[in-house]
Amino acid sequence: MNVEQIVEAIEKLTVAELAELVKALEEKFGVSAAAPIAVAAAAAPAAGAQQAQAEEKTEFDVLLKGFGSNKIGVIKVVREITGLGLKEAKDLVEKAGSPDAIVKSGIPKNEAEDIKKKLEEAGAEVTLK
């Protein structure tokens, strides 16, 4: 496999696959690839570059869009996550669908996904922003 074939293979990778490749190369060779990530994103198609920017986001807000038929269950999970009192959690859940229905903001992606999963298991409709 020559260099051109390697480049062609890399061009076909998704943004997630590129991130995985970078991590593997960093571990294998003990280097940091901060600059090459930007180069790889610039070489990607416009849609891929937009996905890269979305994936580079480090802080997320968890927005409550709805509570379904299990309002009490959702309130309990909101209280557990936020530490709010019963009335405050109830008020937050009742704001579902409005821009003010932020359960938690400025948190890392993995924590935001965990919170989203817990809320969805309780019957809530949730989005990450």
From Swiss-Prot:
Pfam families: Ribosomal_L12, Ribosomal_L12_N. The keyword Mitochondrion does not apply. Keywords: Ribonucleoprotein, Ribosomal protein. GO terms for biological process: translation. One of its GO terms (molecular function) is structural constituent of ribosome. It comes from the Bacteria. One of its GO terms (cellular component) is cytosolic large ribosomal subunit. Homodimer. Part of the ribosomal stalk of the 50S ribosomal subunit. Forms a multimeric L10(L12)X complex, where L10 forms an elongated spine to which 2 to 4 L12 dimers bind in a sequential fashion. Binds GTP-bound translation factors. PANTHER family: 39S RIBOSOMAL PROTEIN L12, LARGE RIBOSOMAL SUBUNIT PROTEIN BL12M. Belongs to the bacterial ribosomal protein bL12 family. Forms part of the ribosomal stalk which helps the ribosome interact with GTP-bound translation factors. Is thus essential for accurate translation. This is Large ribosomal subunit protein bL12. It comes from Pseudothermotoga lettingae (strain ATCC BAA-301 / DSM 14385 / NBRC 107922 / TMO).
